Amino acid sequence: MRWIENVERFVFGSECLGCGKGSERLDPWLCPDCVRELEREAEECRCPTADAYSLFPMRPLTRRLIHALKYREIPGMASYLVKHSRVVGGMLGAELSLLPKPFYFVPVPLHRARFRERGYNQAEKIASALALATGGRVCRWLKRKSFVVSQTKLSKGERERNVADAFVSALPGELPTRGTVIVTDDVYTTGATTGACLNAFGRDFPLMLKVCTLVYDEPASAVADYVADCRMDWEYNSEL
């Protein structure tokens, strides 16, 4: 309806978040060309390890959308990316169909200081979108017990030490007897954060454990992505 489109233009603006060009055909964040590009990138979904799935590779477009999710107060970007992924159909859907059901999506917890700063936990938004798409549930079975510095500029070993023992399990008194626990986060780089989350469940945890993130970023390119993120953040703040 026309009035809905007008509200979307007022709230989100008329510039594509992908290419920055003005467009009257946003849906509501990307122009038709960038939507097609996003769906092409979804065909390149990654499996960084045997136990981890990522819906998209890190590309300039997906980096901008992740930046919008985390820093531009657009939590709806999580469901938007899941919607345009292959989490139901395609290779990833086929992989998930082999796992025991139901799915219990456990978001990587955000420290209270970060939550106050951002207003929401992007991992929870991702978990909710994945649960809706697959018929799963969101379960807050992890707690963060320490605040860690940004992982982006650290090596794999430094990342692992940075998040070691940062999480503890917060399991219900009675666990389900079947299904798959899927730890969710926005970006998979070296697996240090999600690995620390998996370790928090302990060796004798009775359910299958997996990881699912929105994007996979090659460790070698993570610093360049950090620089690009900082540049986009500066450009955005300078407009305010």
What do these predicted ranges mean?
Residues 1-240:
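Glycine-rich phosphate/pyrophosphate-handling loop used in enzymes and phosphotransfer proteins
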